[in-house]
Each structure stands twice: as C-alpha cells, then as structure tokens.
Amino acid sequence: MNFHPYKEGYNTLPKLLKLSTPIFFYKINEEILKLKLESVKNQTVFAEKDMTEEIYEAICNFIVSQVPDLKPPYTFENLAMQLVEDLVIHRIKDGKNWTSAAHVCFPAGWYPEKVVGQSFFETHCEIPMNVANGDKLMKAAIVSGPFERFVWSVSTEKLWNRHPTVERKKFDPKNPSVYVIVERQIIYGFPKLECFLFALQQYFIAEDEIDKQALITALNNMTPEQMKYKSINKEYIDMLKTHWSL
C-alpha cells in the first residue's frame, strides 16, 4: 500500500470512496499476532450489544470466503485474531443505528467497549465534522459500496496500538523520528440484515517515504478545531520544518 492521503489535505468528513481493490483482508503475520495478543492481555478488545447469531454467521462466512486457510472455529472473535484488520459491526433497526460488535486490538485513541452501543453521532460527536446526515450515511454504507476511506495521523513511533492507556513517545528534536499512520477503513454492507462490516487496516509511511512539503502543507491548512482534535500545534509544525530544513 502506497497511498499517501495527507497529499489531499486533512479532512474529517466521512468521505467514502468506492473500493479500489478486491482485497478486503490480509492474513496476519507473527509480528502483528504478537501485538494483538498483547492487546488482548492488557485491554478490552471485544464487546457486543444487541447482536444476532444470523448476523455473526453471515459476516463470518463472508470473511472465510475472502481469506483462504483461516482456522476454525469460524467465530467472529477467532477470525479477527487471524487478520491484520480490526473488525466492527454496525446495525440499523427501527430507525436507530448503533455499533453492535467490535473486536479491536489497535484503537486510535478510543475504548472499543465504550463505542459499542453508541450511534454514529454519539461516536463521532467530538470529531470536527458534519454528522447531520449520519442516518443517510449509515443507509448508504449498507445498500451501496463497498467503500473505503482513509484517515491519517502523524506519530513519532511505529505504534500499532494507540489505546488511551498506552503511553506515547513525544517528539524529540535531538533524536527525531516521524511516521505517518494511515488507517484504511473498509465498509461492506449486508442489506438483508441491515448492517455493515467496518474493517480497520493500518499501515505506516516511514520518514524517508514521506512527501515532507505536502505533509507540512496539510498540517498548516488544518482548522483550529482539527488541530486540537489531532493534538497538533504550530510549535510542533515548526519543529518538523526545522527537522526537515523546510
């Protein structure tokens, strides 16, 4: 994966793109499996609310059809531990929408168990974005697609698990390191069951691969609300510019 979404600026709107590749999932490797097992040990990775066996069965069958050689039992939790991606299921019923199940080992600053049961608006209310059309967006996610969207962050380390309890390393001008963390979010709908699968897939862009001027431009063009949400300030941007001699 070589897509650099920061080149298009920073946007918190739910910009859905038609899926660009038939690949939904990647089978896990030993490095990521070890990190997932550490997450299982140290934090809550699975939660559910008002789920049905019918939905679990349909989604698990879909995953098995996409990835060869997965090992039984073909349960949601067991399959999630065999994939690079984290998995979330969102439902709509009787005019309501909510996150009904989540198996997330690598959350980006949030608690999976707190998101489960929340509506789209409740989950995203602190993000500077327009969620006025959240209900329409949820329906589109189910009946259209499949979709993908990309979100990105700047980090000082290659950190897969950014759970709120995990300590982060601050930028050190004397020993600098910079990564762009990209989260590819894949949305696949199941119209008959009124739900969609949300797969979260991370990859890292190393410092020597970053288009540094494009990244600085994207950071400078953030709104004050976006900068606050991403914990970015002008001082940090200036440190990056100095580090890269821009």
Regions found by a protein language model. Name each.
Residues 1-246:
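Extended, well-ordered protein cores
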